Amino acid sequence: MLTYPNIDPVAIHLGPLQVHWYGLMYLLAFLCAWGLASYRAKQRDGWTSDMVSDLVFYGALGVVLGGRIGYVLFYEFDKFLENPIWLFQVWTGGMSFHGGFLGVMIAMLFWCKKYQKTWFQTLDFVAPCVPTGLMFGRIGNFIGGELYGRAVTDPNYPFGMIFPTDPLHLVRHPSQIYQALCEGLLLFIILWWFSSKPRPRMAVSALFLMGYGVARFVMEFFRQPDADQGFILFGWMTKGQILTVPMLLIGLWMMWYAYQKKIYDWGPQKNS
């Protein structure tokens, strides 16, 4: 069994100002996305550093607003009704990927209108930069001791740990780390490699939806369902899995459509 590194949730103390690890992870996520997007812009015609900076700003707004609102609506609506101010206490944790995803989609519409880019041109450009943000977010969950995994059933399992935030004090899977590695690092490697060569428009976005859909669906088997949600369908499907299935199906259709149309935005087969 591993020992949980009981880290102070406040990363930096500056007098009355406290910087929480959760907020710091989001800052690192946005900085990493900006760096990766800036690198990609240098490899593509029609992209500038100002466009990238604006894109990250729009994306950050979409992630924070959509992620928080989505978490409240999907998972903690009763808590919000009891204390509406809690919606704005982002540093306490509680963000929904699916809400953040929808928030980014809406934000990208405004950015595309401003810079005269198509939606899928933009999403294909952004998609490989997203998984690193997911990775940092899950690390923030781990440090905060939230969204931990299900109880370990094998007493000889070497990676289980007891989270101090768990009222039952059971040996559990560190599912946040599993998700950081699968939904974050592994998906980043796959998307970065796939997007390094000319692909049909929508293909990179499709692979992101498919890759995240598979990774999240599998990781949910290790993650403890929210206490007020439990298993919603068939006695084993969680809210996260139900929300992820449409992403996977849409991604499959998009990949098929992309290779049927074969519209290229860069490379030797670029279409005007």
From Swiss-Prot:
Gene Ontology terms, MF aspect: phosphatidylglycerol-prolipoprotein diacylglyceryl transferase activity
InterPro entries registered for this protein in UniProt: Lgt
Keyword Membrane found: yes
Keyword Transmembrane: yes
Topology with respect to the bilayer: Multi-pass membrane protein
GO cellular component: plasma membrane
Positions with a binding annotation for a 1,2-diacyl-sn-glycero-3-phospho-(1'-sn-glycerol): R138
EC number: 2.5.1.145
Known pathway: Protein modification; lipoprotein biosynthesis (diacylglyceryl transfer)
Upper classification of the organism: Bacteria, Pseudomonadati, Pseudomonadota, Gammaproteobacteria, Moraxellales
Record's function text: Catalyzes the transfer of the diacylglyceryl group from phosphatidylglycerol to the sulfhydryl group of the N-terminal cysteine of a prolipoprotein, the first step in the formation of mature lipoproteins.
Protein name: Phosphatidylglycerol--prolipoprotein diacylglyceryl transferase
Source organism of this protein record: Acinetobacter baumannii (strain ATCC 17978 / DSM 105126 / CIP 53.77 / LMG 1025 / NCDC KC755 / 5377)
Transmembrane portions of the chain: 17-37, 55-75, 90-110, 125-145, 174-194, 202-222, 230-250
Gene from which the chain derives: lgt
GO biological process: lipoprotein biosynthetic process
